[in-house]
């Protein structure tokens, strides 16, 4: 029996794939658990329309990420924190602090998109990467200054 997968099945396929399985497997397992639909013409057209909508949506998100990357690339933000002796910060600057500073400048960036290897604990200028999409990155400069 031919079925259209509604979820990824390990070793079988992913969403929208049309696969051939035994009738019992389809009728007793895949279809009742809503993991697949019978591969009728109507179902195939329905899944194709869903796939095309997803593709358009992903392309729109990708385009928005590219536009944001152009605006964000090379941007510089300044974060002021209290400092102890030897230029060490009280606490550290984390992705949350950087995201907050970027949002204040008008860039809509989530803290999960900011990539730093470890929290910033010293004064200085740092180059930080921001992951906006699967393969779209922007570099920003974070200037850490003493709060007076």
Swiss-Prot record:
The lineage of its organism: Bacteria, Pseudomonadati, Aquificota, Aquificia, Aquificales. Keywords: Ribonucleoprotein, Ribosomal protein, RNA-binding, rRNA-binding. This is Large ribosomal subunit protein bL9. GO terms for biological process: translation. The keyword rRNA-binding applies. One of its GO terms (cellular component) is ribosome. It comes from the Bacteria. Binds to the 23S rRNA. GO terms for molecular function: rRNA binding; structural constituent of ribosome. Belongs to the bacterial ribosomal protein bL9 family. Pfam families: Ribosomal_L9_C, Ribosomal_L9_N. It comes from Hydrogenobaculum sp. (strain Y04AAS1). The keyword Ribonucleoprotein applies.
């Amino acid at each position: 029996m031919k079925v259209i997968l509604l979820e990824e099945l390990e070793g079988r396929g992913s969403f929208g794939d049309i696969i051939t399985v035994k009738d019992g497997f389809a009728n007793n397992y895949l279809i009742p658990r809503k993991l697949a639909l019978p591969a009728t013409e109507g179902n195939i057209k329905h899944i194709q329309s869903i796939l095309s909508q997803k593709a358009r949506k992903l392309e729109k998100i990708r385009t928005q990420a590219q536009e944001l990357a152009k605006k964000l690339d090379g941007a510089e933000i300044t974060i002021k924190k209290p400092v102890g002796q030897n230029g060490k910060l009280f606490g550290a600057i984390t992705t949350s602090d950087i995201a907050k500073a970027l949002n204040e400048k008008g860039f809509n960036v989530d803290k999960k998109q900011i990539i730093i290897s470890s929290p910033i604990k010293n004064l200085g200028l740092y180059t930080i990467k921001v992951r906006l999409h699967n393969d779209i990155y922007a570099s920003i400069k974070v200037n850490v200054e003493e709060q007076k």
